[in-house]
Amino acid sequence: MAAGKARVHELAKELGVTSKEVLARLSEQGEFVKSASSTVEAPVARRLRESFGGSKPAPAKGTAKSPGKGPDKSLDKALDAAIDMAAGNGKATAAPAKAADSGGAAIVSPTTPAAPEPPTAVPPSPQAPHPGMAPGARPGPVPKPGIRTPRVGNNPFSSAQPADRPIPRPPAPRPGTARPGVPRPGASPGSMPPRPGGAVGGARPPRPGAPRPGGRPGAPGAGRSDAGGGNYRGGGVGAAPGTGFRGRPGGGGGGRPGQRGGAAGAFGRPGGAPRRGRKSKRQKRQEYDSMQAPVVGGVRLPHGNGETIRLARGASLSDFADKIDANPAALVQALFNLGEMVTATQSVGDETLELLGSEMNYNVQVVSPEDEDRELLESFDLSYGEDEGGEEDLQVRPPVVTVMGHVDHGKTRLLDTIRKANVREAEAGGITQHIGAYQVAVDLDGSQRLITFIDTPGHEAFTAMRARGAKATDIAILVVAADDGVMPQTVEAINHAQAADVPIVVAVNKIDKEGADPAKIRGQLTEYGLVPEEFGGDTMFVDISAKQGTNIEALEEAVLLTADAALDLRANPDMEAQGVAIEAHLDRGRGPVATVLVQRGTLRVGDSVVAGDAYGRVRRMVDEHGEDVEVALPSRPVQVIGFTSVPGAGDNFLVVDEDRIARQIADRRSARKRNALAARSRKRISLEDLDSALKETSQLNLILKGDNAGTVEALEEALMGIQVDDEVVLRVIDRGVGGITETNVNLASASDAVIIGFNVRAEGKATELASREGVEIRYYSVIYQAIDEIEQALRGLLKPIYEENQLGRAEIRALFRSSKVGLIAGCLVTSGVMRRNAKARLLRDNIVVAENLSIASLRREKDDVTEVRDGFECGLTLGYADIKEGDVIESYELVQKERA
């Protein structure tokens, strides 16, 4: 290459080294070059050539080069080449040049001879040719650096070399290069290049058979320098005798860089025919792994050794691929070929993960939510469910009693009688919609004892809530109506209590009604393992009348006696509080409010608490009477204010040291919950079902909003359990606690969904947006009405119904009392019209307080009017006493309409 500016890769090609080595040498010289395509100045290029040429010391006369890093590397490569050839990678008759093409080098002794040895030729063995060169071979002349493209037949590294081609004559030397047979200055006398076609000293006999092509044009001496990363050969090692080629120009001794030998593409550099040398260890390993890998769906996947892979429920293929160090795209393609359409980030069901793992010889273990949550807490050095300390730290706590039974058998009436309060009338339809927890004081043998009661719904839709109540309780009171007998939910309550290993006290209610037969109830319950004490069993039966208050004290005494006899109710009050969230709802003024039951430890105001995927700091605690509580001891139910979001009903709560820890635990639980929900609710589409999936199907999308988390969960479980035809699909795309917002309406509009509001109403702008977007919002206050209508809608068996037409809204500004008409509400009509005798409902913070009211009287100033329009004040009566300033009255009328 002519002197002057040159690019780095051109210099590397000229010097016979890689661009990376040239860049490293330039960096050592203080020249910082950016890339291999950068240009260097002429002085820099000259110094670089001198550096590569001068770095190779001239071999002493008759003395091999000192062993160093280069000989070790070349020796390893030569050994690898010999092993490959012995294993069948090369032919037994391959020339030493062939071995050199496979990446091998001449094997030299690692020791330096003390005295020069006479040049002798060693005849090669026809069985196992040695890849080394004759030690007496003379080096060839060093031509001027430049680029020379040899003929096809002149490439000693080409596998297509003809065996019977005559040995070509060596090319004539170019001007400026040493002539053949003339030693370079500083070179050893025995390093003359071999004569074409001749042997050294005539000591090498001709090889039988066809003549071989010449050896690789090797460099006299060391070949490439150590810095160049080339193969190392001792001094005096050149081309094999009889090859007709001179050794590789350049290299050691003279210090001038040699040119590339062989055709373009030799030594792994670009150009020429593709290299067909020895595979690297990495390539061999990859080929071996691919041969061993199992084929699943036409795709080669990693092969396991029976290892156990732990995956969370709802994990994706990306999560699985990370565990086994595989490509997620390969897993996706394998499932696609097997008829399963799943993306890499999509949650996958347990069966699919286990099947895919078994095909690859992996034991996939889907971690249960309980185990996963326990591992999560252990990562923060936390534990749940055990009392800290020893026996001396445990103190007696009140029993937690759950009232269970069939719907309308009198559970809430019994609790009313015990609490001396009337909470039954607040439930729509007289049916308990959510769980309530209360603590009452009972006199027993002159001492005051505390009992905590949990009221659970009896309707069939609340199975999950009854199961949670059984898990959080110590004793179960089974209420059975004496005139009705054992019903399906009665049997279910028995199963929940027995599954939780909870003692049962049976309260035979309504003994004051006609047709009551307590003896019949005892006989029926005997079939389910509840044998009365009078029959020789261990279950206490108490005949009561919740309405008349008969034998209530006897029932309380039976509860305490059962607790003292069968249970060891003790807890450590000196540890961080732990317990369970009984219910939770969103209050407009106070934010998320959760009713929690402290099971162990002491809960205090200011504690950092986490419950499920909600966290926060306890800002305020309120008991069942609305009074503030500073400290909550074990078995104490309180309302906790301070959560950042609404906890789920039945979620475990515990106190942690810092808000940061609570937030991290809640975030991880939230992500796990989303994945599990996506894996459970998403229906997979297989290739066999693709044709039917592309057809138009009847799908009902729902958005559920309720006043508390337990009710929303129960409603969703009941709706998803409706059995309909396969052509009709029910899908819940969102659920939440609180009023219906604009976000819910926008989601419903985008997904063609119907919004179900349970004991909640839509906000003002949300109603307008729903009307504008054509989104249907349906309101319910009794759960079985919602279930029945949704089921009828899915089955297409709906009869003509009455559609609600909203008339207007009015805000209560003042209250007046009258001896004639009772409580009068002074209102300002904010929208629409208020009409006399119209239906109305009372809202407080968008929560339905009263339903099915009627505007009995309506006055404007002192005149009786039939309606009052938007922007005017009026006075009206509803026939309902529990109204407050700030409440909203919503008037509506029912219009009969045919369903589509």
Swiss-Prot record:
Residues 509-512 are annotated as: G4. Pfam families: EF-G_D2, GTP_EFTU, IF-2, IF2_N. Keywords: Cytoplasm, GTP-binding, Initiation factor, Nucleotide-binding, Protein biosynthesis. One of its GO terms (molecular function) is GTP binding. GTP binds at residues 405-412, 455-459, 509-512. Residues 430-434 are annotated as: G2. Its main location: cytoplasm. The keyword Cytoplasm applies. Residues 275-284 have a biased composition (Basic residues). Transmembrane segments: none annotated. Residues 545-547 are annotated as: G5. The keyword Lipid biosynthesis does not apply. Residues 113-129 have a biased composition (Pro residues). Residues 455-458 are annotated as: G3. Residues 30-77, 89-291 are annotated as: Disordered. Residues 215-271 have a biased composition (Gly residues). GO terms for cellular component: cytoplasm; cytosol; peptidoglycan-based cell wall; plasma membrane. One of its GO terms (biological process) is translational initiation. Residues 89-112, 175-187 have a biased composition (Low complexity). InterPro entries: EF-G-like_DII, IF2_II, IF2_N, P-loop_NTPase, Small_GTP-bd, T_Tr_GTP-bd_dom, TF_IF2_bacterial-like, TIF_IF2. Residues 396-567 form the tr-type G domain. Belongs to the TRAFAC class translation factor GTPase superfamily. Classic translation factor GTPase family. IF-2 subfamily. PANTHER family: TR-TYPE G DOMAIN-CONTAINING PROTEIN, TRANSLATION INITIATION FACTOR IF-2-RELATED. One of the essential components for the initiation of protein synthesis. Protects formylmethionyl-tRNA from spontaneous hydrolysis and promotes its binding to the 30S ribosomal subunits. Also involved in the hydrolysis of GTP during the formation of the 70S ribosomal complex. This is Translation initiation factor IF-2. It comes from Mycobacterium tuberculosis (strain ATCC 25618 / H37Rv). The lineage of its organism: Bacteria, Bacillati, Actinomycetota, Actinomycetes, Mycobacteriales. The gene is infB.
